[in-house]
């Protein structure tokens, strides 16, 4: 039940948010069991990755696509694929878990619901307001650049010059300000006791921040090369895009991998399909890249 609920939440609160929300109850509910390692494997596949495929908020690769012209709700095209894969994985999980559960019971293990902390409590519901602010900020980041008020006479998005040709666009600045404001208000208005009980630390956030800064800086030359030479790779079919994106997403971060192959697809010269900043991408190919990045990103922790 928790796996299905978390999978449904992932596209609307993000895979990271859904994982943080569901992991503590999942661990506590199964703490009495000896055979439980398989639970986190399915947790990672379903909640931490696959469940986020329906919106750009769900998984970072789709956010990169949204920022490059893919419509916000286009990812809902992946719903049938998500349903099929979720049913398959939950069916496999059911039989594996039932077998492990019966072995634990046979050895005399059983849950002790008398211990403190075994009841489910939902605290901090006011944070839904700040979550809505973040969702709005993401949507604005993709819609504001198309408005005349944010464009100069040449049609380019206005912004603040940072370094040579690099500039911080006003839509991006608005997005950052709203998200930081939501985070600040959440931190200040939520009782510290709630974070303490959830064992909240800044460690994971710092690690992800450092990792992403490094990845996105070093990937720029590769993206420029692919934009110019992508058509020469010989990857022209959706199934090729799916496996190439998926395999690399398993060992690299799936966000830059998605961006690399979206750039490649946009450079192939297609005339029919989804219009993006990077070029026209056939719908089937965009679906293949999206599924490869989101679904196979679960194969390793990276």
PLM feature segments, named:
Residues 2-8, 44-53, 110-117, 204-217, ...:
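Small-residue-rich segments of transmembrane alpha-helices in multi-pass membrane proteins
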Residues 10, 20-35, 39-41, 47, ...:
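Membrane-interfacial helix-loop connectors
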Residues 35, 54-55, 73-119, 295-302:
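Juxtamembrane and boundary regions of transmembrane helices in multi-pass small-molecule transporters
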Residues 1, 27-30, 93-99, 186-200:
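C-terminal ends of transmembrane helices
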Residues 54, 59-75, 137-149:
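Transmembrane helix-loop junctions at the membrane interface of multipass transporters and ion channels
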Residues 4, 8, 83-91, 95, ...:
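Generic alpha-helical transmembrane segments of integral inner-membrane proteins
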Residues 131-269:
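Transmembrane helical segments that form the transport core of multi-pass membrane transport proteins
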Residues 89-156:
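Long, contiguous bundles of hydrophobic transmembrane helices that form the permeation core
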């Amino acid at each position: 039940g928790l796996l299905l609920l978390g999978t449904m939440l992932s596209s609307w609160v993000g895979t990271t948010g859904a994982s943080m929300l569901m992991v503590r109850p999942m661990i506590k509910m199964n703490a009495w069991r000896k055979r439980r390692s398989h639970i986190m494997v399915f947790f990672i596949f379903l909640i931490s990755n696959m469940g986020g495929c329906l919106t750009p908020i769900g998984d970072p690769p789709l956010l990169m696509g949204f920022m490059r012209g893919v419509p916000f709700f286009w990812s809902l095209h992946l719903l049938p694929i998500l349903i099929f894969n979720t049913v398959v994985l939950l069916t496999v999980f059911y039989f594996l878990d039932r077998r492990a559960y019966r072995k634990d019971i046979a050895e005399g293990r059983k849950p002790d619901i008398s211990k403190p902390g075994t009841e489910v409590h939902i605290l901090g519901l006011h944070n839904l307001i700040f979550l809505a602010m973040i969702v709005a900020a993401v949507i604005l980041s993709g819609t504001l650049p198309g408005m005349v008020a944010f464009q100069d006479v040449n049609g380019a998005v206005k912004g603040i010059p940072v370094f040579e040709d690099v500039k911080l666009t006003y839509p991006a600045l608005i997005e950052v300000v709203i998200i930081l404001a939501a985070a600040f208000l959440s931190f200040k208005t939520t009782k510290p006791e709630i974070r303490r009980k959830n064992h909240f630390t800044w460690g994971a956030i710092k690690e992800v921040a450092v990792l992403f800064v490094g990845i996105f800086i070093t990937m720029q030359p590769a993206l420029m090369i692919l934009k110019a030479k992508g058509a020469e790779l010989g990857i022209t079919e959706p199934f090729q895009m799916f496996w190439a994106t998926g395999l690399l997403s398993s060992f690299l971060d799936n966000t830059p991998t998605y961006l690399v192959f979206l750039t490649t697809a946009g450079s192939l010269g297609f005339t029919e399909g989804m219009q993006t900043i990077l070029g026209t991408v056939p719908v089937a190919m965009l679906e293949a890249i999206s599924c490869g990045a989101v679904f196979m990103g679960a194969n390793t922790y990276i």
